[in-house]
Amino acid sequence: MKRFLLATCLVAVLLWEAGAIPAHQVPVKTKGKHVFPEQETEKAWGTRAMEPLEKDDQLRALLPVPKQKLAATEEKHSDTMTWVETKDILSRFRNPLQGPELDLDSIYHPMSEDVQNEEVPQSRPILYRQVLHGPEEDLDHISHSLEDSGEP
């Protein structure tokens, strides 16, 4: 239990230092005003949420940048940084090819006529027929013992 509490405190301190947990920007107690703390928190978060993402460099690396915006920022920062254009790897699923599929049967099946015309000998299983004359012999004693039958 002590280790869990210590680990939780350590994670909280690391997140606080990294800036993941925002500091309290609005005091809970105000002088002379009767304002609910939830409203002040919403105002504080609203202003934080409206700030542009350019100020937050941590999120810029995670979010995809549109190509128009990429070209505009490339002109501004061409001397300091070089931008790599992102490739849309899902475009073939969003825009499927028109027309029939390619015929790829030749990969798995040979195309030569000699192989196709050649008949493969098929072996048929030999069925043995047993003609019974009269009633069938009782073979239950092989799989069932007398003890299992429950007869005295």
Swiss-Prot record:
InterPro entries: PRAP. The keyword Signal applies. One of its GO terms (cellular component) is endoplasmic reticulum. Residues 1-20 form the signal peptide. Keywords: Endoplasmic reticulum, Lipid-binding, Secreted, Signal. GO terms for molecular function: triglyceride binding. It is found in: Secreted; Endoplasmic reticulum. Its main location: secreted. GO terms for biological process: cellular response to X-ray; deactivation of mitotic spindle assembly checkpoint; DNA damage response; DNA damage response, signal transduction by p53 class mediator; negative regulation of apoptotic process; positive regulation of intestinal lipid absorption; positive regulation of phospholipid transport; positive regulation of triglyceride transport. Pfam families: PRAP (PF15314). Highly expressed in the small intestine where it shows a proximal-distal graded expression. The keyword Secreted applies. Lipid-binding protein which promotes lipid absorption by facilitating MTTP-mediated lipid transfer (mainly triglycerides and phospholipids) and MTTP-mediated apoB lipoprotein assembly and secretion. Protects the gastrointestinal epithelium from irradiation-induced apoptosis. May play an important role in maintaining normal growth homeostasis in epithelial cells. Involved in p53/TP53-dependent cell survival after DNA damage. Interacts with MTTP. Interacts with MAD1L1. This is Proline-rich acidic protein 1.
